[in-house]
Amino acid sequence: MERVERIIEFEIARINSHLPRARKSLKDLLNMEEPMITLRDGSVHYFKRQELELLASLLDEEEIAMLRLPMVLEISTVERDKIIIRGKVEAKVIRKILGFEEAIIEEPILKLPRYYLPKIRRILPTTTVHAFIVEW
C-alpha cells in the first residue's frame, strides 16, 4: 500500500504545480508595478490590479498587510463536498465577497459547500487558487 500512497502523493503534487512557491501580502502586491508571484512549476502568475484594489477596499490597513495572496481554496479528499479557507483575514474576505453577514467571532477556518467554488473563482480569478489536499 505504501507504493500506491507515494504514487497518489506524486500525482497530487503534479496537479498542484499551479500553486505559489510563496505567497505575498496584499500590501506588497499593491506596491508592485506588476503584481506577480512565481509558481511551483516555475511559471509566473500575475494579479489583476482591479482585484487587489477590491480586496483592499474590504479591509483595514492591518488586514491589508496580513492578507496573503493568492488565497488558497482547499479541496480535501475527506470533506469532498466542502472547500476550506484558512486564515481569519482570508475567511473575512470570502464572507464579504459572497455577501454573508459579518461574523461575531472571526474564525481562522471557513468551510463552505463546494458549490461556492465557481462563484468565488469568478469574482476573484487571479487572487484565489484551488488546491487538492490528500488526507488519509
Swiss-Prot record:
- Any single Pfam family the record assigns to this protein: DUF61
Entry's InterPro entries? UPF0216
The record's family statement is:
Belongs to the UPF0216 family.
Q: Please name the HAMAP family in this protein's record.
A: UPF0216
Q: What is this protein called in UniProt? A: UPF0216 protein PYRAB16100
